[in-house]
A protein has these predicted regions:
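Acidic, Ser/Thr- and Gly-enriched intrinsically disordered low-complexity segments
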Residues: 43, 49-50, 102, 116, ...
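A eukaryote-biased signal for long
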Residues: 107-110, 152, 170-188
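Alpha-helical rod/repeat scaffolding segments in eukaryotic adaptors/tethers
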Residues: 23, 27, 31, 55, ...
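DNA polymerase processivity clamps
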Residues: 59-71, 100-112, 165-173
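Short, well-structured hydrophobic secondary-structure segments
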Residues: 37-83
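Intrinsic, low-complexity N-terminal interaction/targeting segments
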Residues: 1-17, 74-126, 182-186
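The feature marks the first
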Residues: 1-55
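Mixed-charge, glycine-accented linear interaction segment located at domain edges/termini
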Residues: 38, 119-176
Length: 188
């Protein structure tokens, strides 16, 4: 499967991430990522990016702090070169996994010595549906791209925003009110 485009969008109604993978042959794989899978996938992808970049001798020889800086610079370089402006093409000739997105229940990441990253994506199925899976072979720039799109979508979903209880909101309002009404004391 030669991947041409990736798209990750937050669907507020479903409260899921819709991942669409388009091939050069105009085939499209559609995947639903739940909050649990979407958030948990970010760290392994970051690790995969770090391992891919560690294949570069300049990165390998660096100390830990320098290695992190070099990896961050490579991510920035990717973002500068990536085509993030071209809209995702909605023309599709085939949907190998069907029209409905596959609900992802497990993702396994394998990094190969040549820098190719393999994602084995599974849907355990349930009573009404048969288990499905697909394998995506991503070149390093696609891993960078998927990580970037996933991070953006998770941010838009607000899944990682802290949840404030009414008590916390009330306490914050009371503290602000007390600060505003507090008498100013001047000393000489």
């Amino acid at each position: 499967m030669n991947i041409h485009q990736l798209n990750v969008q937050y669907d507020e109604r479903q409260d899921r991430l819709l991942v669409r993978v388009k091939t050069v042959q105009e085939q499209e794989v559609r995947l639903w990522l739940t909050r649990r899978i979407g958030v948990k996938l970010v760290e392994p992808l970051m690790t995969a990016v770090a391992r891919i970049e560690a294949l570069d001798p300049a990165v390998t020889l660096a100390d830990e702090a320098s290695r992190k800086i070099l990896i961050d610079l490579k991510q920035e370089d990717f973002l500068q070169k990536a085509d993030l402006q071209t809209p995702y093409s909605n023309t599709t000739t085939a949907l190998p996994l069907g029209e409905l997105p596959m609900l992802v229940t497990e993702v396994t990441i394998h990094l190969h010595a040549n820098g190719l990253t393999q994602l084995v994506i599974k849907d355990g199925g349930d009573e009404g549906q048969q288990a499905r899976n697909c394998t995506l072979n991503l070149q390093s720039f696609m891993v960078h791209g998927l990580l970037h799109l996933l991070q953006q979508a998770v941010h838009r979903s607000q899944w990682l925003d802290p949840i404030e209880s009414p008590d916390q909101e009330e306490s914050a309002e009371q503290a602000e009110q007390a600060r505003r009404t507090q008498k100013k004391i001047y000393t000489h």
